[in-house]
């Protein structure tokens, strides 16, 4: 399932309209419509806001979403999503850190798993904080 399909499914299974979710998530109806049609990709803040609106975690929101290579259609790399969802490790990450980590790529390669992402976070935190 693509992220756009997952977003539509979450809304429809609750019997809600686009404007209901958009208002609660503080995004525009056209933007939510574009997300549900796969026309645009959400920011981390939007994913967090939508997850909160649905009463679930970002990890739960991404559950069942297909990943292409190491990136899902419009979301975070799988290993980074796993790190965010980890109750102990993910709690340390602020939205700024998540945005920073999500941009890490060198020659088309990214960290592979939760542990790789966490090690990079620790190294950057030690240097930058």
From Swiss-Prot:
The protein's name in its UniProt record: HTH-type transcriptional regulator DdrOP3
Keyword annotations of the record: DNA-binding, Plasmid, Repressor, Stress response, Transcription, Transcription regulation
SMART domains from the UniProt entry: HTH_XRE
Keyword Repressor: yes
Upper classification of the organism: Bacteria, Thermotogati, Deinococcota, Deinococci, Deinococcales
Molecular functions (GO terms): DNA binding; DNA-binding transcription factor activity
DNA-binding region, residue range(s): 18-37
InterPro entries: Bact_TransReg_Diox, Cro/C1-type_HTH, Lambda_DNA-bd_dom_sf
Cross-referenced SUPFAM superfamilies: lambda repressor-like DNA-binding domains (SSF47413)
UniProt function note: Repressor specific for genes preceded by a radiation/desiccation response motif (RDRM) site, which is present upstream of several radiation-induced genes.
């Amino acid at each position: 399932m693509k992220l756009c399909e997952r977003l539509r499914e979450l809304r429809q299974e609750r019997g809600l309209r686009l404007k209901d979710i958009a208002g609660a998530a503080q995004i525009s109806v056209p933007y939510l419509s574009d997300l549900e049609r796969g026309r645009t990709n959400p920011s981390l803040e939007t994913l967090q806001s939508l997850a909160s609106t649905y009463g679930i975690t970002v990890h739960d929101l991404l559950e069942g979403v297909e990943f292409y290579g190491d990136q899902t259609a419009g979301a975070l790399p799988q290993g980074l999503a796993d790190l965010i969802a980890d109750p102990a490790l993910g709690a340390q990450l602020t939205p700024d850190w998540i945005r920073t980590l999500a941009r890490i790529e060198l020659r088309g390669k990214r960290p592979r798993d939760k542990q790789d992402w966490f090690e990079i976070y620790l190294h950057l935190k030690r240097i930058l904080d």
